[in-house]
A protein has these predicted regions:
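Mature extracytoplasmic enzyme cores
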Residues: 1-2, 8, 22-32, 50-304, ...
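Catalytic domains of carbohydrate-active enzymes, especially glycoside hydrolases
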Residues: 21-43, 59-63, 70-72, 325, ...
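Hydrophobic alpha-helical scaffolding
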Residues: 47-50, 203-210, 214, 308-312, ...
Length: 390
């Protein structure tokens, strides 16, 4: 308002490998618009954290410093944050994303025997791409793994009223055949696998794994420190994460309740948390992440325990680890997750818990690019910016 440069608003400066004169002009135009800061948008650049990137950043930083400006750095080469500049493309399996999937089979009538060849269920069912994924993903080049694990066999009674209506059949694991005499009532056999062959971004970090998230720091943050240590905390204000995700489910689907998800985000930390919560038979409760209808109190307990584990792991291993690194190096950490349609409280394209997802950041934020937040409050109409019912 007084024509003095401000840092309250800072635009994104999209970089495509422009020449030096253009880069200097862009920085000056931002400054002359009474804006004292900007965020370097790395994703369209042809050589992020490569020689041309450092060449272009040298120019931008020199110009920004001469004008007394600050800049933030968007922290990845692909959208969303988590690609780690390609560091996960050939990463060991244990660092990659993993999902829990469930296949349910109707049991025969009460008193009859269910016999199942477990060799037919050694692997999870193949993933089915959504229409959006068929158009936007190169399905022939999606990374695939052969380390599927059959982890649990559980019989679940329809309209069950408690733990007595969950039958742990894991003693059959490792055997050729499962034999189960069906008790009174209507039952389903739930076959649960861990698989890495799910999700649209299989070459992204696992947000629940400290070692996996460290790949992002090593690939992006550390090289910037190595090149520009003298700018940290002065011209370089910090780093920006854009819409990091857990990545299970389908590409940018929204509005699904937990029991409607085709797969659930997983890590070794989730296994540990559920074992601590439910004991040695923890895996017999896994069908209740999906099963409808069943005792609502027990379903709620299982789902809350799962989501609590997932989101605490995200906070600790991703958000706080990155934020702690930034503060230890004299800069700040900011960004946002997908919030539309309450997605901030879900997995898939977001991180399951708004405050834990941003717990390591110095300033929390939201995306307001489609008019979904207005001066009088949130838009209460029936549609989101993507045309989906809210």
């Amino acid at each position: 308002m007084n024509e003095q440069p401000s840092s309250y608003i800072f635009p994104f400066l999209w970089l495509h490998g422009e020449d030096e004169a253009t880069l200097r002009k862009y920085v000056r135009v931002i400054h002359d618009s009474c804006l004292n800061a900007f965020c370097v948008e790395s994703r369209p650049h042809p050589a992020f954290v490569g020689p041309q990137w450092w060449h272009d950043m040298d120019i931008i930083l020199e110009e920004a410093r001469s004008l007394g400006m600050q800049l933030w750095i968007l922290d990845d080469s692909h959208f969303p944050t988590g690609y780690a500049a390609g560091a996960m493309v050939n990463a060991p399996a244990e660092l990659c994303r993993q999902s829990l999937v469930c296949q349910a089979i109707d049991c025969p009538a009460s008193g009859e025997w269910l016999e199942l060849s477990l060799a037919d269920y050694a692997k999870a069912q193949p993933a089915q791409l959504s229409m959006m994924e068929q158009y936007t993903l190169d399905a022939d080049h999606l990374r695939t793994w052969d380390d599927d694990q059959l982890i649990s066999l559980v019989a679940v009674k329809e309209h069950g009223t408690g733990e007595q209506d969950l039958v742990d059949l894991n003693e059959a694991l490792g055997q050729e055949t499962l034999r189960f005499q069906v008790p009174e009532g209507k039952w389903k056999l739930h076959i649960l696998h861990l698989t890495r062959n799910r999700g649209p971004h299989r070459d992204y970090i696992n947000m629940m794994s400290a070692a996996s998230c460290r790949r992002l720091i090593d690939a992006v943050y550390e090289p910037h420190w190595a090149h520009y240590q003298s700018y940290f905390g002065s011209t370089i204000a910090g780093f920006f994460s854009d819409e990091p995700e857990l990545g299970n489910g389908h590409l940018y689907e929204s509005g699904k309740a937990i029991w409607q998800m085709e797969d659930h985000a997983w890590s070794a930390g989730v296994t540990k948390a559920l074992r601590e919560a439910f004991g040695a038979e923890w895996s017999k409760y896994l069908p209740l992440l999906w099963e409808q209808p069943f005792d609502s109190d027990l379903c709620a307990r299982v789902r809350l325990t799962y989501m609590d584990a997932v989101t605490h792991l995200v906070e600790q291993n991703f958000s706080e680890q990155v934020g702690d690194w930034c503060r230890a190096h004299g800069v700040k950490y900011i960004g946002h997750v997908i919030e539309d349609n309450n997605q901030h409280s879900r997995t898939g394209s977001s991180l399951g818990h708004y405050f834990r997802a941003l717990g390591g950041q110095d300033m929390a934020g939201i995306d307001d690019i489609g008019g979904q937040v207005l001066p009088q409050g949130e838009w209460n109409g029936p549609w989101s910016v993507s045309g989906e019912v809210r």
